[in-house]
Amino acid sequence: MKKAICALLSLFLLFGTLTLPALAAQDGEGTGTLPVSGEPEPPTDEPPTEDAAPDFAVLPFDDETTLIRPWRSELSGEWVLFLPAGADLTALTVETGADALLLGGTELHGGDKTDLLQPDAVLPLQIGERELTLRVLASENLPSVFISTESGSLDYIHADKSHKEKGRITTVENGEVTLSDAELKQIKGRGNSTWNYEKKPYNIKFDKKTGLLGMEKAKKWSLLASYVDQSLLRNPLATYLSNAMGLYFTPDYRWADLYVNGEYQGNYLIYESVEVGETRVDIHDLAADNEEANPDVDDLEDLPQVGTGPDGAVEDGYVFGSRKWIDIPNDPATIDGGYLLELEYRNRYPDELSGFVSKRGQCVVLKAPECASEWEVAYISSFYNEAEEALYAPDGRNSLGRHYSEYFDLPSLARMYILEEYAAEYDCGISSNYFYKDADSGLLVASPIWDFDIAFGRTDVVYDDMWLRDPAIWFANMRFERSGANGVTVVQPTVFNLVYRSAEFRQLVRETWQSYRELFAPANLTAEIDAMAGRIEASAVMDAIRWDLHRTTASDTTRAKVREQIGAVRSYVTGRTPALNRGFSENAALLYYEPNGAVGFMSHNAISAIGDAVTLYGDSRGKTIRLKAPEAGLSLLGWCEDPNGDGPVYAPGDRLTLQRQVTTLYAIWGVAPAVVEHTALLGDVDRDGQISAADARLALRAAVGLEVFAEKTDAPRFLLADLDGDKTITASDARLILRAAVGLDDLEGKTVTFTEPETPDEPENPENPENPSDPENPSDPENPSDPENPNDPENPSDPENPSDPENPSDPENPENPENPENPENPENPSDPEKPENPENPVEPTADQEG
């Protein structure tokens, strides 16, 4: 065994990338020509370059397929050996093609066992004349997965995501080999934006159903790289919440350290793929029905792809209402399910085999059956379009009279919305959102979850400083996609954006959120995060060093950085839960995005929400909402760009065209006036009780822009002038009013009922203290017409008011000059007993006597 491994290792090092399984395949056990470019260079006598792999490897387990070799850090120049968890660190087998090597000053030969390779050790390594530095890191707690490609390299697979290659796989759990050198039918790239990163995600497929790391047997598995999520926790946290909330068919997963062709690739999430199957999305398998109905077709994927374009072509681009399918000769007996649908970005949609673009512009991919027939795509697209029409309708009903609740399973939709909103998952409602429709079911069920690495306060590297880090934002209920068709750009609101406008759905969300308050409690989630973090920390440190995430190979420094990433997730959930407790309260504010323009819609007279202002982003980044809770009894009167309310105030429901990339609006609070209901004749624009030419003139002025009848702020005139009910005042409306005024048309006494704020001159308002015309208002101190108001000191008409010093009609007023009994009145000429009165003509003065 020792000599065989040493000989193979020498060849491995000469050719640079060939692994043991690859060499075995070329020795008669292979499967054909390897998909590699060119031939390996012949060996030379030149000394190895600085970055050439050293003649050194380690066998951590008693299985030759687990042989691993060190990786060179370009940053430090060190060679780093990443050891899997469960290896016996006191007796690791060293392999080398050299006669001997010096490790930490100890001479070792191929096949020797050593205890020198301890975690965090930094050792000198000398092989012949090469003097190297070897840093040792070791994982803990996690299983390890060893994959070898048929070519012995990842170059062909990395050249294009569609490239496939055969391989073999070994798994180790708790130090025990649980799957040894099993055949892989294929390994290939996967993902969308994640495929563009240095650390690649992969899909693997077995020939037969195989269990991995204790999970249920299946053929397909996904290896997620989590490159943008340096905490490595976000997908697992979403999975934990999904399972706890009872979302259907939540994919299972395991963390694992992945080695490919002997080189450490990092910490990966081995996830169950999203597909129809007994152990996955367990609904009726319509794809199997298609195969059974077409026994003469070896592979349905080889049949032509057809579309609704001219002559059956698949439309080149993004066309509303278009469909595409596979030209399958025979349909099954029934085609009502099961369907697994994925909402997708428009730029990714062309790569899919079967799908449709809804009449409103939503791209929908058929994940099952992937090879769908024309009638299958027609059936499910018609069903989805009806559901979408109901979502767009103000009353939630489509033109068939069917409510959106007749198309969607609302409990699952509410749970999925809450999870997407809580996580502020970047693709929510646009991509990686799945719905399934089973056979004999009339509902789309929101499940399963997928792809939460850009969530929980984490953004894509490109948008690293975006507002998504803020835990006090609305996101899922405002998400949209900007789309283009035939030179026209539209804004496509998501299913969550649309359904959250429904008061019934919001109430269901509030009730559902309340039922999971303990699950989302910060104490519960931070405890779960800490448990996850403790399990993967050693592996996370290795992963960060392997991919130079923190520009260091020092484990202590890297560990501190990893903990910072964990802390960011903890901080997010700590702030997110109380924010949504407010956001999902009975009187929370709502801001949603209206399609076909950069228009923010504020609705609901709200009195509490998530912060202190609302920020609207004029580009595709989305919208946020923050409202400061006012004092008790106040209502939201509108929004203003000035925090003090100076300037235009936009009423809830008004359209606001964003003039800049970012606009901040402040909530204006106050006591809302009482509202009264009025009824007027349709066409009586000036509300004088009759339809006349003056009404037609007002409507015409509005039609040509000389008058402005705002639908929200001038509702009465708008409603009375809009005779054809198209929510626009046109010359046609003015003409209809004029015809009615001159008797050519009869409006049959049609009326319009509307509400208006109660005004201070309303004569029937007994509570109005400023109403001078209300004779029955006893509490109005300024009402001069109330003769019975004893509290009015300025009321000259009250003869019984003894407290009025200027009342000339009060005979008991001591200052009344007409009061003959007033001895204190110095100007009273009629007082005969007042000798001090110089003007008293009756009583002579003292000077006049004598």
Please annotate each region the language model reported.
Residues 99-125, 642-666:
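Serine/threonine-rich, repeat-prone extracellular segments and beta-strand-based repeat modules
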